[in-house]
From Swiss-Prot:
Top-level taxon of origin: Bacteria
Database matches in InterPro entries: Trm112-like
Protein family according to the UniProt entry: Belongs to the UPF0434 family.
Disulfide bonds: none
Organism for this UniProt entry: Agrobacterium fabrum (strain C58 / ATCC 33970) (Agrobacterium tumefaciens (strain C58))
Protein name: UPF0434 protein Atu3696
Matches recorded under HAMAP family: UPF0434 (MF_01187)
Entry GO CC: cytosol
C-alpha cells in the first residue's frame, strides 16, 4: 500500500488540531505531512493515517 495520500479530506483537516497548540493544520502534499505553523511541527502521514504524536513530528527549521 502506498503511504502517500492523494488528497486529504477537508473535513478531516477541520477536525484535526495540533496536539501541542490545539491550532489548525494544513496539508503539505510534497512531504505528505500535516503542518502546524504555530508549533513549527510537521506530522507525518503513514499508510494514509496521520501520526499526531509530538514525538513523531519533524521540527520545521525555516
Amino acid at each position: 500500500m502506498d503511504d502517500r495520500m492523494s488528497n486529504v479530506d477537508p473535513k478531516l483537516l477541520e477536525l484535526l488540531v495540533c496536539p501541542l497548540t490545539k491550532g489548525r493544520l494544513s496539508y503539505d502534499r510534497t512531504h505528505n505531512e500535516l503542518i502546524s505553523e504555530s508549533a513549527r511541527l510537521a506530522y507525518p502521514i503513514r499508510d494514509g493515517v496521520p501520526i499526531m504524536l509530538i514525538s513523531e513530528a519533524r521540527k520545521i527549521e525555516e
